UniProtKB/Swiss-Prot annotation:
Its EC number is 2.7.11.1. The active site is at D150 (proton acceptor). It comes from Caenorhabditis briggsae. This is Serine/threonine-protein kinase chk-1. Serine/threonine-protein kinase which is required for checkpoint-mediated cell cycle arrest and activation of DNA repair in response to the presence of DNA damage or unreplicated DNA. May also negatively regulate cell cycle progression during unperturbed cell cycles. Required for checkpoint mediated cell cycle arrest in response to DNA damage in germline cells. Essential for embryogenesis. Residues 312-324 have a biased composition (Polar residues). GO terms for biological process: mitotic G2 DNA damage checkpoint signaling. Residues 333-344 have a biased composition (Basic and acidic residues). Residues 308-348 are annotated as: Disordered. Pfam families: Pkinase (PF00069). It is found in: Cytoplasm; Nucleus. One of its GO terms (cellular component) is nucleus. It catalyses: L-seryl-[protein] + ATP = O-phospho-L-seryl-[protein] + ADP + H(+); L-threonyl-[protein] + ATP = O-phospho-L-threonyl-[protein] + ADP + H(+). ATP binds at L32, G33, E34, G35, A36, F37, G38, E39, V40, K56.
Length: 493
């Protein structure tokens, strides 16, 4: 169907509630993400697998750790009381046997960064479609007196009906209490997306730093690259931007004048002049009609019926969507029975306490786009099919990765951990039972999402002769990779 990008994605969807005191009512399907202090698991109701919830499992270590985890839950619980389509809702929390369990809404469409093509980005209409949702989500969060402090594509999840959801509130905090705003001083976030006042290490206002980060996200969507490594005097590219000296260079020359003018208002180091969310919503780029998108919508997941011992009355609105292909249709995938333990990446569910800890959040993937063993597979772009069997494909994969200059380590049967500098990706080979093909699946393990996509493209290009020509259509038909949204420009646009 055709959807005007000026409108929101489809609205009211099912309402899940949290698992109850007994673990017998649900089972773990797979690991969604891992970190030094815990993991995120996909769990489903035993009686109805369509009832899916993300469960964040964190070990109790110190009182400070417990306080930070509870703070994260209370923030999301506060946001969930009224609810909004554009953030991941907290469903419940439980503590038992030395672990905290945080139950969250599950977004089955992957991460926003997966839609960003390195060095190209995405069509302006699609970028505008997602950016409008990001701004609506931030407006709601800020209106609830909360600031996120780590807005980046990896923390922006999608549903199969193209609803964008802000996730990971581990660095979020209350910036206003009873109408009185307070200055913040904790240096946190991810460096390339962090505002200059955060990088400087001083006190700062809450909402403007989220606005800044949203501008960097928009640049990534429009151009497929980041403008600088750090918004500080140590970055030549950043100083050139402040001096208005490099607009004929990348990434600026990849965008139109409207986008550039809006970004000038967003990415100013003068906090008092930086655009507010209300000003962004009336900006010519934001309101311009760039066209229509051909959207396909998934079937809503059924409502999960659970109870939570800490939040017995928890009943939160959700926007979960079922996969376009039924679980039964996806059972022609074979995965290795034995999975070796993989060292958990450096991660933090709580808030960094030093400026140098900003780097920490670049080495973690607590997102919901990671897949290990399959029963329900998130649709993702970073997959392809080969013409050969698993052993041959495995050797070719190692050869292509090593010749690209990447470090390759086998972690389990048919699984490889491929690393280049600060970025790692887990590669898994799946034998298709009903097809004489092997599907190669890449997922980001740590590091920047755009750099991960560049690594994937490098390996894929080196294996081009081995890729099955009709494999892409097969993966699209099965729902393992997304179909590209159709863009229709209006005659008067």
């Amino acid at each position: 169907m055709s959807a005007d990008v000026s409108t929101k994605p489809r609205g009211s969807l099912p309402i899940p509630t949290a698992p109850g005191e007994s673990n017998e009512c649900y089972r773990v399907i797979r690991t969604l993400g891992e970190g030094a202090f815990g993991e995120v698991l996909l769990i489903v109701n035993n009686k109805n697998p369509d009832m899916a919830v993300a469960m964040k499992k964190m070990q109790i270590t110190t009182q400070a750790n417990t306080n930070n985890i509870r703070k994260e839950f209370l923030i999301q619980q506060k946001l969930s009381k009224v609810g909004h389509d554009n953030f991941i809702r907290a469903i419940g929390m439980r503590t038992e046997n030395g672990f905290h369990f945080l139950f969250l809404e599950y977004a089955d469409g992957g991460e926003l960064f997966d839609k960003i093509e390195p060095d190209h980005g995405m069509p302006t209409a699609i970028a505008q479609f997602y950016f409008r949702q990001l701004i609506e989500g931030l407006k709601y969060i800020h209106d609830c007196d909360i600031v996120h402090r780590d807005i980046k594509p990896e923390n922006l999840l999608l549903t199969t009906s193209h609803v964008l959801k802000i996730s990971d509130f581990g660095m979020a905090t209350l910036y206003r209490n009873e109408g009185k705003e307070r200055l913040l001083d904790l240096s946190c976030g991810t460096i390339p997306y962090a505002a200059p006042e955060v990088c400087a290490g001083g006190k700062y206002r809450g909402p403007p730093i989220d606005v800044w980060s949203s501008g960097i996200v928009l640049i990534a969507m429009l151009t497929g690259e980041l403008p600088w490594d750090r918004a500080s005097d140590s970055s030549y590219a950043y100083l050139q931007w402040l001096g208005n000296n490099n607009l004929d260079e990348n990434p600026w020359r990849k965008m139109d004048v409207r986008a550039l003018c809006m970004l000038r208002r967003i990415l100013t180091d003068n906090v008092h002049r930086r655009a507010t969310i209300e000003q962004i919503k009336t900006d010519p780029w934001f309101t311009h009609n760039y066209g229509k998108l051909e959207m396909t919508y998934g079937r809503p997941l059924k409502r999960a019926r659970y109870a939570d011992e800490n939040s017995p009355d928890c009943n939160i609105s959700s926007t979960q969507q079922a996969d376009a292909v039924s679980t039964a249709k996806r059972r022609h995938l074979e995965t290795p029975d034995k999975v070796a333990h993989v060292e958990r990446q450096n991660a933090s569910f709580s808030q960094p306490t030093r400026t140098e800890d900003l780097l920490l959040t670049q080495n973690i993937d607590m997102s919901q786009n990671n897949t290990n063993l399959l029963e329900r597979m998130v649709c993702r772009m970073t997959r392809f099919c080969t013409k050969f069997d698993v052993p041959t494909s495995y050797r070719q994969l190692i050869h292509a990765s090593e010749h690209a200059g990447y470090e390759v380590r086998q972690t389990a049967d048919n699984r490889l951990l491929v690393t280049f500098r600060e970025v790692s990706m887990m590669v898994t080979l799946y034998s298709l039972k009903t097809e004489s093909r092997v599907m190669v699946d890449f997922r980001r393990s740590r590091g920047d999402g755009i750099q991960f996509k560049k690594m994937f493209l490098e390996v894929r290009n080196r294996m081009n002769d081995s890729i099955c020509v009709d494999g892409q259509n097969f993966l699209e038909d099965c729902g393992y990779v997304p179909r590209k949204p159709q863009f229709v420009r209006e005659a008067n646009a």
